[in-house]
Design a protein with these regions (language model features):
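Juxtamembrane intracellular "pre-TM" segments in multi-pass secondary transporters
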Residues: 2-7, 189-220
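Conserved MFS/SLC helix-loop-helix module at the cytosolic interface between two early adjacent transmembrane helices
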Residues: 63-102
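Helix-loop-helix hairpin linking two adjacent transmembrane segments in secondary transporters
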Residues: 103, 132-133, 140-186
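Paired small-residue
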Residues: 87-94, 102-110, 308-316
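Cytoplasmic helix-loop-helix junction between adjacent transmembrane helices
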Residues: 107-148
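Helix-to-loop junctions at the C-terminal end of transmembrane segments
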Residues: 65-76, 266-279
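Helix-breaking motifs and short loop linkers at transmembrane-helix boundaries and internal kinks
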Residues: 42-44, 76, 97-103, 114, ...
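A late C-terminal transmembrane helix in Major Facilitator Superfamily
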Residues: 331-367, 377
Length: 405
């Protein structure tokens, strides 16, 4: 069947509504980064312990998807989506009232579970309505809009923290959730009709079938490595930029947001180029840019150039990430034709579970200075490139057919 290579207005509207939902996860990660040093002081704990609030969020975001995926295949997409957003809102309010670290960690775990449900639904809805090039373009458009989160969230969070403290940042996440809940209730339709729903019997067999399919597993691992890179950057950036490079919380938010623009631009480039070059080539080009940018930042910092080298290098790396992620996502999701909720759940679980390991490692390395942290990022970039090249080798025929439609 011949597919369109341009997106109709209805798809643009759907992508905008889905992107608002998809922003909840990144906002829950990025918006409070500048607040972490202040949170450590107020809660009388270490920076590394406050970083655990990010780690548990990511673990819940990953593990929760394994439970949520079959649920969305059985019940449809709309009701689980609204429930997940409501949980996210309640947990954000709870986190804003935390007086001790363990309360914050519990609230962030619950918030991650709510975000897990929303992420599964977003991924599944795209594949419910599109495949091939159109799906890749929708994922790229989604990532372009979601790319605003790492640009705006740290800046907004830094400003809120400067004037009102970190608790206001958590309440802002609750307000974003409320806006998303209203928009979803009004404008997001059900995309999985009852005839296409499947019972959750044999959930473990479904997951095993998907996981052992190399057409799924390799792009899933490559995408997970790319997000490991991203969260390794996130996990160390706040401390390195503020302690070693002397930025204030507000200035950090602006600089971090500026590097986040690169993800948005990379996703935009991916959406424009995918029909011409195919998903495999784009993913390889993006992964090599990640490696090159990280190496540039490392060499510049080693030579004493400081932030003047780190920011351009990370801009290049994050541009590559934005280009690669939509292509890798399309290859992983395109490997399956049914149980798409379970496919999205397994992809998200692998992605977030591996990514969650990056934040404590990066936090520990960043406490030793910029060079160990940047070396860690360069090694992560090398892993992304290796896995992406392996993915491209098993996807050439598939990628060619996508590019031709």
């Amino acid at each position: 069947m011949q597919q369109q290579t341009t997106l109709p207005a209805a798809s643009l509207g759907l992508a905008a509504s889905l992107a608002l939902v998809a922003v909840l996860g990144p906002a829950g990660i990025d918006m409070y980064l500048a607040s972490m040093p202040a949170m450590a002081r107020e809660l009388h704990t270490s920076y590394a312990n406050v970083q655990l609030s990010l780690t548990v969020f990511l673990l819940a975001l990953g593990g929760g998807q394994l439970l949520c995926g079959p649920l969305t295949d059985m019940l449809g997409r709309r009701r689980p989506l609204l429930a997940g957003i409501a949980v996210y809102i309640a947990a954000a309010v709870w986190a804003s009232q935390a007086e001790q670290l363990h309360t914050l960690l519990l609230a962030r775990t619950v918030q991650g579970l709510g975000a897990a449900l929303t992420l599964v639904v977003v991924m599944s809805m795209v594949r419910d309505v599109a495949d091939g090039v159109k799906a890749a373009q929708l994922f790229a458009l989604l990532m372009t809009i979601v790319g605003l989160a790492p640009v705006l969230a740290p800046a907004v969070g830094g400003l809120l923290d400067s004037y009102y403290g970190w608790r206001a940042v958590m309440l802002a996440l609750a307000a974003l959730g409320a806006l998303t809940l209203l928009n979803s209730a009004l404008f997001l339709p059900e995309t999985l009709p009852p005839a296409r729903r499947i019972a959750p019997q044999g959930m473990h067999r479904t997951y095993a079938r998907i996981a052992f399919d190399r057409a799924f597993l390799l792009p899933a691992l490559a995408l997970s490595a790319a997000f490991f890179f991203l969260f390794a950057y996130i996990g160390g950036a706040s401390l390195v930029y503020q302690r070693d490079f002397g930025l204030s919380a507000g200035s950090f938010g602006l600089v971090f947001g500026a590097t986040g623009v690169a993800v948005l631009l990379g996703a935009m480039a991916s959406g424009r180029l995918v029909s011409r070059h195919g998903v495999a080539r784009l993913s390889v080009a993006g992964s090599l840019a990640m490696l090159g940018g990280a190496a540039l930042a490392l060499l510049g910092a080693w030579a004493g150039a400081g932030i003047a080298a780190v920011v351009p290098g990370m801009f290049m790396a994050l541009f590559g990430l934005g280009m690669a992620e939509a292509a890798l996502m399309a290859m992983a999701m395109g490997s399956q034709q049914r149980a798409l909720g379970s496919t999205a759940a397994l992809l998200g679980a692998i992605q977030m579970s591996l990514s969650s390991l990056a934040t404590p490692l990066a936090a520990g390395l960043s406490e030793r200075g910029p060079l160990p942290w940047l070396l860690f990022l360069t090694v992560a970039g090398l892993l992304v490139s290796w896995l992406t090249l392996a993915t491209a080798r098993i996807h050439p025929a598939h990628a060619t057919s996508l590019g031709a439609h």
